[in-house]
Every structure is written in C-alpha cells, then in structure tokens.
C-alpha cells in the first residue's frame, strides 16, 4: 500500500467512524460493543481471533461473517494496539488427543516444546502437532497470545454450539491449561484477560457464551465479564424461514450500530487481499 492509498484509507475510516457515532441505537448489542471497545482501549496489546468462515461465490459481492465484522470494527476502533488473526485462513490441524493416552497425559510436556526460536521465542509453545506436522500454524497464535494483555475470540453459533474452527482452536490450546493443572507448572495466561463474542440465528447463543466463559476460567484466563456476549437474530428456535435469514444481516447492523459503509469498506479490503 502506497502513501496515497494509506491516506485515503484513513480518510474513509474517519468518515465511517464518524457516521457510526451518529444516531446510535439503544440496544443491548450496541451497548455491549461499546463497552467491549472501552475495556480494550485500556490495554497495551489486544489479540482478536476471528473463527467464522464464509465462502465467496461472487468477488463483487463479498460476504463477511457477522462475528468477523464485530472483530474488524473493534480492530479499527483500537488501532495499533490490535493484532487481528483470521483463524479460518490458517492451517490449524486437529488435536492429536495426547491428553488422554492409555499411558497417561502427555499433552504439553517438555518433550513437545517447539524448538524453532523464531516460532517459539518464549519457549512456552509445547504442542506435539507442531513437531509431528511442521506445516501447522498454531505457533503463530501462541506467539501473539503470550505477548498480549487481552484476547477475544469471535465465532458463529452452529447447531447450538460454538463452530468447528473455534472448537478446534480451543482443543489445540489444551497444552496451556494442561501445563498448570496436570503438570503442576506455572499458569502462563493468568494475567491475560479473555473474552468471547458470538453471533447466531435462532438458538442457544447465551448458553454458548456461558459455556465458553466457564471453559476460559478452566483454562486459567483472567475473565473480563465485559468481553463476553452474543448477538442472536431471534429467540424463536423454530424460526427457520428464508425471510428471517434474509432479514438477519440488516438487523445485525441495526442492533450493533455498525454502518453499511463500514461493511462495504471491509468488503473492498477483503477483495484486495
């Protein structure tokens, strides 16, 4: 990106942010989003992990998942203190299940330490997958995580649960929790504040948030209540009409106060990349 493109980008974002502060909605989602941003502005470094995907059928009509839009909006509001990562575009292989082998729990033991200092500068990354499958990219996430004051996970709700990308990521990070629970070593994330924000259509969103909050407590994160919430189109779990799905996107924007101009801007950015 050259200087002129960067200046144009800044001008566009100033206009979009200014628009988003006009005619703000009086909704729980808008208040939650504002509170999240206010909390994260207090931090020195924030990691945002987006875990929802969307196939693009038309390059001229980019479709960005709702939870990712929230993450991108927060990213623009916070600026340079944010590291944003799209987990769905990374090679995060499945967990090998070493936590429950017949000879005991070998997840996160010292032998599993990734020895490449460029990938594991802290020396804390211990996941067997990164040894057995060198192409795996989980190290990119842990490297940023250990340098952050706060981490927020974003996902969609699918069939009443957090989606597969998020679940896979949490399984793969088990070695962090296992280190201080089973192996009796230090808790590496006790001072890292955590959050989880999800979006869904019609079922179980609040319960998903509660479950993930409890999971993060088990992991050893420092829970920040302001960073846990969800948006859901309807509470009617039997509403599967095409009409409701088509109305969902507009209602999401209205409830959160995210402007269509912001979505269009991010769509152009996605198309370029």
Language model: regions and residue ranges:
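Short, glycine-/small-residue-rich phosphate/pyrophosphate-handling segment
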Residues: 163-165, 182-228
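N-terminal beta1-alpha1-beta2 submodule of the flavodoxin-like/Rossmannoid cofactor-binding fold
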Residues: 20-155, 159-178, 242-273
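Extracellular serine-dependent O-acyl
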Residues: 84-90, 223-231
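Short Gly/Pro-enriched loop/turn and capping motifs at secondary-structure junctions
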Residues: 98, 201-203, 233
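Charge-dense, intrinsically disordered terminal/linker segments
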Residues: 1-33
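Ligand-binding pocket scaffold of soluble enzyme catalytic domains
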Residues: 36-39, 48-50, 195-197, 225-237
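Generic alpha-helical structural context detector
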Residues: 12-15, 171, 214
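A generic structural signal for short coil/turn motifs at secondary-structure boundaries
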Residues: 55-59, 203, 236
